[in-house]
């Protein structure tokens, strides 16, 4: 059954990304819906295979300036994250399964977080953020000799014929970085371990 069904292995449930623009930074937050995902096409003891989150950032609607990691043939394939966190479970480094000569990076046991503050932004520019949840795939087995590479959520940005953004997936945020208006009192935020409190 694995030989016929493995190709339908699916990424974790898509998280919802929330973004707030501040002066010189953008605060990104999300929930934990992805972490209880079950992949029914994997062996029963491996079905809860969520591993972590990555955030990709681009100033391009097609996310092209983030797609800089190439495959073994030199073709753009993977996006370079500006943030990554993963479960503390001993699953670290690169996946055992390669795709066109390239392995997916699974993390370094940092611990799962639900926020990120991007302080490397310029006021007056628009940024596109994609938050993806990913799993650890499946190492080669007797049933699946090639194994299953890790998978992550898609980042969907829908454009009209004039290339204006008309919609995005729940895990994508389009944010205009701007300085606060005169007299504006910014909300405060504090970080306590994995919690981000905004007031």
Residue ranges and their predicted role:
Residues 1-199:
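Extracellular/surface-associated beta-sandwich interaction domains
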């Amino acid at each position: 059954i694995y030989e016929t069904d493995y190709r339908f292995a699916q990424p974790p449930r898509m998280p919802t990304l929330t973004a707030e623009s501040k002066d010189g930074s953008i605060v990104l937050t999300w929930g934990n819906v992805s972490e209880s995902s079950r992949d029914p096409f994997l062996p029963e003891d491996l079905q809860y295979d969520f591993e972590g989150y990555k955030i990709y950032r681009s100033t391009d609607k097609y996310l092209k300036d983030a797609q800089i990691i190439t495959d073994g043939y030199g073709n753009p394939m993977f996006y370079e994250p500006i943030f990554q966190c993963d479960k503390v479970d001993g699953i670290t480094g690169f996946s055992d399964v390669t795709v066109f000569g390239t392995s997916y990076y699974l993390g370094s046991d940092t611990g799962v977080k639900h926020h990120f503050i991007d302080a490397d932004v310029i006021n007056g520019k628009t940024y596109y953020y994609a938050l993806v949840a990913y799993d650890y795939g499946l190492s080669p087995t007797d049933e699946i000799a090639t194994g299953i590479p890790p998978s992550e959520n898609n980042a969907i940005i829908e454009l009209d014929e004039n290339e204006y953004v008309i919609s995005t997936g729940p895990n994508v945020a389009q944010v205009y970085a701007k300085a606060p208006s005169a007299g504006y009192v910014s909300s405060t935020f504090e970080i306590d371990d994995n919690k981000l409190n905004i007031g």
